């Protein structure tokens, strides 16, 4: 029946499932939809996501739904958790079935494929200017979130009421803290750039450069993120919060990060195709590198780390040589651009 769920979650991968579990654990009725009906039926049969979160049973209030129109009729609030390169096409698929009072939030991290646009711009183009929008971003590994381990995240929304409602739905005093932030540009950008820097951190560790180099790369990566954000109109403080520094440190230092593992294998000399096969899931940073570098060019921002990672990924530059290129750059003031 329409109106019988607090939230619809679109995307039954690891992160979408973890967020659905979190919402249901908070006592809310949640519907989880995925594009593959057979996968949804399998999840319903065993009441857990065996592929990604095998040790976390679904709460009773988490329901599975294979029909998109049925799912979207059940609630005004829709949480999208899909890879960034299909974000626009998923919105287009949802649009005819959305309720008139629909509100859209996404936890997708990245930029639109090819154009490099923020996902907010994509949502506005597809859905129009009136629908409330919000984005969740921050240091959240799906396994830890689903297990109920303490986690904090940032939430940015176009509408204050929507922001407050989302905080109420998601916030759990025992394990999940949600910080509101009005800076949609910064919150979205942080989630994209950190993917790129995490690949760089993995490459550095794969080569064997050590903790000093990793920390320097994270710090200078944060500087690149902040410079691009300033040029795009983001608030500087956002990049010192959950969606900036928080997510950057997490993704660069823990091997639960696909982006970091991707870089780690490249740094160890594993071939590109073998790396992709080993990871087995979408590595957002691979596409994001091209898109972030295009954004930097558009706004006239120097991003040397991003540029070298791009050359490794797309121009077959040797990873060790890319690192030496960065180390050999001209001396400059730490506070200066580049």
UniProtKB/Swiss-Prot annotation:
Alphabetical UniProt keywords: Cytoplasm, Lipid biosynthesis, Lipid metabolism, NAD, NADP, Nucleotide-binding, Oxidoreductase, Phospholipid biosynthesis, Phospholipid metabolism
Record GO terms (molecular function): glycerol-3-phosphate dehydrogenase [NAD(P)+] activity; NAD binding
Localisation per UniProt entry: Cytoplasm
Residues that, per the record, bind NADPH: 14-15, 35, 109, 142, 258, 282, 284
Residues of the active site: 194 (proton acceptor)
Catalytic reaction annotation: sn-glycerol 3-phosphate + NAD(+) = dihydroxyacetone phosphate + NADH + H(+); sn-glycerol 3-phosphate + NADP(+) = dihydroxyacetone phosphate + NADPH + H(+)
Pathway(s) of this molecule: Membrane lipid metabolism; glycerophospholipid metabolism
NAD recorded as keyword: yes
CC annotations in GO: cytosol
This enzyme's EC code(s): 1.1.1.94
Xref: SUPFAM superfamilies: 6-phosphogluconate dehydrogenase C-terminal domain-like (SSF48179), NAD(P)-binding Rossmann-fold domains (SSF51735)
Predominant place of localization: cytoplasm
Binding site for sn-glycerol 3-phosphate: 109, 138, 140, 194, 247, 257-259
Keyword Transferase annotated: no
GO terms classed as biological process: carbohydrate metabolic process; glycerol-3-phosphate biosynthetic process; glycerol-3-phosphate catabolic process; glycerophospholipid biosynthetic process
Top-level taxon of the source organism: Bacteria
Family membership: Belongs to the NAD-dependent glycerol-3-phosphate dehydrogenase family.
Entry function: Catalyzes the reduction of the glycolytic intermediate dihydroxyacetone phosphate (DHAP) to sn-glycerol 3-phosphate (G3P), the key precursor for phospholipid synthesis.
Protein name: Glycerol-3-phosphate dehydrogenase [NAD(P)+]
